[in-house]
A protein has these predicted regions:
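General secretory precursor processing signal
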Residues: 14, 25-28, 33, 64, ...
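Positively charged n-region of N-terminal signal peptides that target proteins for export
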Residues: 1-4
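A short, solvent-exposed beta-edge/loop patch
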Residues: 100-166
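N-terminal "mature-domain start" segment
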Residues: 21-62, 142, 147, 151-166
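Alpha-helical structural motif
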Residues: 10, 34, 84-87
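Bacterial N-terminal signal peptides
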Residues: 7-19
């Protein structure tokens, strides 16, 4: 009888161990965007780098495809602000180009019109959802007109990040 009890306990322990995810193989995921979506925008399989999350849940996700100076990159940074009315202006000052307001993305968002070369296209959106700010930067190697405006991909990414922050 004792032997059956031990066998039953051992079987239950093994079943529990086999059904739980392995700690060594667990991966942290970007809460704002998944790798498949980023890969679709960047044109292939991506590598994901994350900063450790803060107590408030702030996190930076960087998706990249390729290596070195020719890498395609998507950088998403999310920060919590103590005083959004004052602090958001500081984040907007990071905009290196002309600011164009964007409607229906979070509580407030702007496109930073950056200078594009004939081979590199860089787009940036800075937005706010309640007390959280997000900065989305997309770098791709394509021919882009300097006056092309915000690409549909970048707008969709900004909408998805803002939606995940609500």
């Amino acid at each position: 009888m004792r032997r059956l009890l031990w066998i039953a306990m051992l079987s239950m322990a093994m079943a529990g161990w086999l059904s739980s995810p392995a700690a060594c193989c667990a991966s942290t995921r970007c809460p704002w965007l998944n790798a498949a979506t980023a890969g679709g925008v960047l044109g292939g399989e991506v590598q994901v780098d994350l900063t450790p999350p803060t107590v408030q849940g702030d996190l930076t996700c960087e998706f990249s495809r390729g290596q070195g100076s020719s890498a395609y990159k998507l950088h998403i940074a999310v920060h919590t602000m103590q005083d959004p009315s004052k602090e958001f202006k500081r984040y907007l000052s990071r905009c290196d180009g002309q600011r164009v307001p964007l409607k229906a993305i979070g509580n407030e968002a702007v496109q930073c019109v950056l200078k594009n070369s004939s081979t590199v296209s860089e787009e940036q959106v800075i937005g706010r959802v309640r007390e959280r700010v997000f900065i989305l930067t997309l770098v791709r190697y394509t021919s882009a007109s300097p006056n092309a405006g915000l690409s549909e991909d970048t707008r969709n990414l900004a909408e998805q990040v803002a939606g995940n922050l609500f």
